[in-house]
């Protein structure tokens, strides 16, 4: 026997005591608040690591992940036992519903909340409702807790850095979190009842095991009964010569509570080489003896038997792996604990798991009369009671890679669809991100407007966002009906058309406007506006004149107790001696005294309501860019006011690419976007012309710096540019290639998740949100009763 195994067996040897109560079955002797457990003679510590997008990665990325994971395995300490665990945990239905459903408020919106909640429940029922959590547990023999803590501190830092290289976040679990894992497994269906307070426990003289153990454990030869649940533990008995990297994914892809664990015992390389050399020497000796016997029988041409030749070949390959390919010898035990409500269900699930193993040419077997030992081995406690070791190299062990696909299920998150791979709900809380900037990208008909409206509906209906303001720049007149239906008296829909009654003052400026000098910022805005009006652009002389006049207009208006307007600016321009000032004044004439004076005089729109839609559909294509610019400036004023009041603002800007058609408007909008972020706003840009966006350095920088991007179906040229800018693989980009409406990719922080989002058509919300002719309610139409 290898020295490492001999030493480990000696260390793990415990005196067996007959358990007198259920608590005695749990092999943890003592716990510390930092999450260190004493299990037998060993100290153990558990770390939780997040999933990464392995299944949807390209072949090159998969190889890179595989090699990085191999490095992690190679870094494991040979003096400790490492356990990698995948925990399929069913979400508690009551907790789940509380976390995702909107509470009713007793107002007219409850009908819409009911529709939205029913949609969420239908999706949740269709989803498997299983949360997959992944842990790595280190167990080591140390003299005392101080030595153990020092060891775990060093090993933990090493693990965190290795997982970070994979793109996975690794965090250590404290005692409460580790006990919760055990409680949720032992007492399934009672997850919400877990309460653990170490101080109270000691005060009452209780054991920590009292808070996690099942009501009873019945032992049978091939299954256990934990309280009212049935449990069976299997182990991997026989391995195939070649195993695919998706075996672990398929084994754990069950809509059931289960624990899959791999116990790893690394062997020091010098010891491993010595062992393999001894084995090879034994094989060579056997071959020599066989040949000597053949020669004695005058059989000088005999061929060495196949099994001996195979042993020699495999031993040489193994030795070569250890000495020249930086592989390590590992001993591994794989256990799988599955649970069910009935014995029949347990038998059915067992057969399903066995068939998955057979598909991969492996053999899983049920542990006979060792079920309790198997359970303690499968759980992330740090115990190992099963000795069904298999000798593997680092590479062959790395094939059992535990990664699948990233999930986004934030507490207090907003629904954005279902994960296209795991079918779990995607719940995003943008407050958790580094910045709250968002982009909705897609070709016409891909579902951009619908996605934006669905988000707006959620914000207007959910009580958590009741105090937030929503401001929408609406170039196509698509959002008014929805906002009016859900907002009623709290909503303003401003229809900005030539000669209309709704007006906006382009020169309006609140206190605190801009990042530094408000006059300079407003001057920049006016330059952008004139550039939109006069396509010849704004030269250096024009800029000087505009800057001078803007600085003069505001103090004069303030003295007379009025609000400065574009009419005042035009008048001031006419007073200037330069001819170019007269040119600028002439450009502004149409917007001040002409037929398009809706931005030249004092505002008539009620901007104090929480929900405001700026509908510029009637402006025409020529004037929309200027209208979008004025609206952005108006929104910036409102965001600044809300920021001072401690209020959050959600900003939606459709046809976003228009802002970057000219240099000055691009500079102004880049500054405005930056201020949105700094002043507590959640800006969302919506566009179908991704190519225009990416041609602008400023716009592409804004896009790449955004933490939240929803990519729906993309045109071929846009796909290539997006993939390059956001570093997305071809496999991942396939989800935005000829995708159905409402399907695509979400980039959420560092996560990249394919999603499917389909809303039920037989609802009033759908009629308010869809833009399909004949199905939806649009700006000028009657809202359904």
Show the residue positions of the predicted features.
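Hydrophobic anchor at the beta1->P-loop junction of P-loop NTPases
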Residues: 440
